[in-house]
From Swiss-Prot:
Growth hormone plays an important role in growth control and is involved in the regulation of several anabolic processes. Implicated as an osmoregulatory substance important for seawater adaptation. Disulfide bonds join C71-C173, C190-C198. It is found in: Secreted. The keyword Signal applies. The keyword Cell membrane does not apply. GO terms for biological process: animal organ development; growth hormone receptor signaling pathway; hyperosmotic salinity response; positive regulation of growth; positive regulation of receptor signaling pathway via JAK-STAT; response to L-arginine; response to peptide hormone; response to starvation. Keywords: Disulfide bond, Hormone, Metal-binding, Secreted, Signal, Zinc. This is Somatotropin. Zn(2+) binds at H38, E182. Residues 1-22 form the signal peptide. Belongs to the somatotropin/prolactin family. It comes from Heteropneustes fossilis (Stinging catfish). The gene is gh. InterPro entries: 4_helix_cytokine-like_core (IPR009079), Somatotropin (IPR034975), Somatotropin/Prolactin (IPR001400), Somatotropin_CS (IPR018116).
Length: 200
């Protein structure tokens, strides 16, 4: 009887531990999603403010340029479209999000925003790193070979009225990448929860 009670106690304790780990995991995912949503909203606001300050002719000209432009993050392998995102593993979504955030580590310093975007990105990157470590149970999360090239020179340009094309490109790419990360983290969070419906 005593042995049965000991075994039962161990089982109950393990269940509580597992449940606690699940709650902590969800808390970390919630925090990461909230942070990237804030960054995405901030990027959209900066983009709107920038476009409102343009003359109609300038706005028309720039809207034709960006679809043909190349973002720094385009060199990062990432799920394309809803179907591919849905089929990607949680670990792949986290790795991709980590690399996208990392790609803005230096360019973000030129966004000229008083809200310390670089610090917000650094905090989010750290949080995603913790989530990756949790997914791989302490194994190496990112290979050294996965480190990618420094941002293109264009991305080091500061926002200025005399450089509308580069400023527009910088803001457009930032908004685009924050949207990507928000999507990837939201799907990853859903996958790690009890919700069985994670459609986009």
């Amino acid at each position: 009887m005593a042995r049965v009670l000991v075994v039962l106690s161990v089982v109950v304790a393990s269940l509580f531990f597992s449940q606690g780990a699940t709650f902590e995991n969800q808390r970390l995912f919630n925090n990461a999603v909230i942070r990237v949503q804030h960054l995405h909203q901030l990027a959209a606001k900066m983009m709107d403010d920038f476009e409102e300050a343009l003359l109609p002719e300038e706005r028309k000209q720039l809207s034709k340029i960006f679809p043909l432009s190349f973002c720094n993050s385009d060199s990062i392998e990432a799920p394309a479209g809803k179907d591919e995102t849905q089929k990607s593993s949680v670990l792949k979504l986290l790795h991709t999000s980590y690399r996208l955030i990392e790609s803005w580590e230096f360019p973000s310093k030129n966004l000229g925003n008083p809200n310390h975007i670089s610090e917000k990105l650094a905090d989010l990157k750290m949080g995603i790193g913790v989530l990756i470590e949790g997914c791989v149970d302490g194994q190496t999360s990112l290979d050294e070979n996965d480190a990618f090239a420094p941002p293109f020179e264009d991305f080091y340009q500061t926002l200025s009225e005399g450089n509308l094309k580069k400023s527009f490109r910088l803001l457009s790419c930032f908004k685009k990448d924050m949207h990507k990360v928000e999507t990837y983290l939201s799907v990853a969070k859903c996958r790690r929860s009890l919700d069985s419906n994670c459609t986009l």
